[in-house]
Regions:
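Terminal or standalone catalytic/regulatory effector modules within metabolic enzymes
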Residues: 1-173
Length: 173
């Protein structure tokens, strides 16, 4: 069992920004630059359409920023891009430096727990997924991780951490 946890830890290697954010967020003096309150993703794939037009995705995101809630929708070539576009519509108005940040790598893996969770529903398509994302602002690169049973939730967690990492220490009320 300890070996399984150790293997999972090393699978998360490269996501140090998420781990550091977990520590920073526990501090009493840390002010989150934004909070994602809700995210809805509408993804449609039409296999009868030409390949370049098959996927139509729209994300609606509700974000709290500076004590105010903002709701916005955006489209993308898939759910990750649609969520990223929606978040940026709101956040770049307040934090223009986020326009420098780009998603460079995106990796999804199943986490196999070797019986830790314990039932067959947690295997295969029902398993936890680990999403690892690498971001860059042209100068620095940082990795984030999201782990959930829902691939979209894990992906959104990565995007949140990636954007928040760029803003850490810059947010003042």
């Amino acid at each position: 069992m300890a070996r399984d946890f150790k293997e999972d830890f090393f699978r998360l290697d490269g996501a140090w920004a998420s781990f550091e954010l977990m520590s920073i967020r526990r501090r009493d003096d840390y002010l989150k630059p934004f909070r994602v309150l809700r995210c809805k993703i509408d993804d449609q794939v039409d296999f009868q359409a030409p390949e370049t037009l098959r996927s139509a995705t729209e994300a609606t995101v509700l974000i709290e920023i500076f004590g105010e809630e903002e709701l916005v929708a955006a489209s993308g070539r898939g759910p990750v891009q649609a969520v990223d576009n929606a978040m940026r519509k709101i956040l770049e108005k307040h934090y223009p430096q986020l326009s420098e940040v780009g998603l460079e790598e995106f990796d999804v893996r199943l986490l196999h727990h070797g019986g830790i969770i314990g039932d067959d529903e947690d295997k295969g398509a029902g398993a936890l997924v680990r999403v690892l994302a690498i971001f860059s602002d042209g100068t620095d690169r940082w990795g984030t991780v999201g782990v959930a049973a829902d691939i979209l939730q894990a992906s959104v967690e990565c995007i949140i951490d990636g954007l928040e990492w760029k803003l850490r220490g810059e947010h003042k009320h």
